[in-house]
């Protein structure tokens, strides 16, 4: 009976760990980014999937294309920085002189832009891979980076 209980606990742990792993772009899309053109809706699907897995990611639709495709940005931050996102934003405006006052935080905002022209696919492919790297909660180096900055 103890062996059966132990086996069940071990199976639950292994399955729970496997489920908790973030799918890579290749696993999600069925091909490695850059090997094929990724349609816009699949990129949005992947960003939404990753954001649903990680509470430290916020997706914002800031507009749409002429073809009514959503234009989105992803905000990645540590839990502490995500909780004070508005303060960090206004402090950055104060540092640039766009708002008056003295900043109370020293957290920079790192804006990463990938696409300038809609018909150039390399930016979207790079964005998908970079987003996965930055969103992976098991990447200790990135988690350390996110303590010191907000990435958009």
What are these regions (language model features)?
Residues 7-17:
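Bacterial N-terminal signal peptides
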């Amino acid at each position: 009976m103890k062996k059966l209980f132990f086996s069940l606990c071990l199976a639950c742990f292994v399955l729970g760990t496997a489920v908790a792993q973030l799918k890579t772009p290749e696993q999600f899309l069925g091909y490695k980014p850059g090997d094929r053109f990724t349609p816009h809706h699949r990129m949005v699907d992947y960003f939404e999937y990753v954001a649903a897995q990680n509470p430290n990611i916020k997706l914002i639709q800031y507009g749409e294309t002429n073809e009514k495709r959503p234009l989105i940005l992803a905000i990645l931050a540590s839990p502490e920085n995500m909780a004070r996102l508005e303060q960090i934003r206004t402090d950055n405006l104060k540092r640039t002189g766009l708002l008056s006052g003295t900043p109370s935080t020293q957290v920079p905002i790192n804006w990463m832009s990938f696409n300038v022209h809609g018909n150039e696919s390399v930016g979207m492919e790079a964005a998908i891979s970079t987003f996965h790297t930055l969103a992976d909660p098991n990447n200790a180096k990135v988690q350390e980076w996110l303590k010191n900055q907000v990435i958009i």
